[in-house]
Amino acid sequence: NAHPLIPPRLLQLRSVRFGILIAMLFFSVWSGFMFCMALTMQTGLGMAPWQSGNSFIALGVTYFISAWFAPRLIARYSTSTILLTGLAIQIAGLLALIATFRVWGMENTALTLAPATGLVGYGQALIVNSFYRIGMRDIQPDDAGAASAILSTLQQAALGLGPAIFGAILLHALQNHHGDYTQAVN
């Protein structure tokens, strides 16, 4: 009379496996990025917590705008196209963030970071909007609860692992660059 908590047949579905991959990679990188950015801004750039928080306003605003339009974009194009577009925009934002740190260094402010963090936020919302749609694509109604629980649990686990992994990478880079945050994040 044994019934597995997770029906094994769900793990055989390509969409669920891809959703698991997205959850583990994307959400761990995302939470690690947010942790390392906050640490860099407060400890490295000497920003007060409120200044560091204000540096993410552009990210939040563009995330909201992107999330508002994402369902219409997905309906018009496709979930996969919007996922890839979100990844491209987010990568562009991260590259812009690296360039911003190279140009402004220790003189960065919420204003100098806004264009890059705005791109990151816009891409982020497109990716998150695509995540559950892809992971749940092939799920039958009877399995919806278990499948969404798999994806949600892995999302939360990845969000917890990200700061530990990327925080360790940042601290190692700081040791190699003698505590210079500008060099460590580049």
PLM regions: where:
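12-transmembrane solute porter fold
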Residues: H3-N176, N186
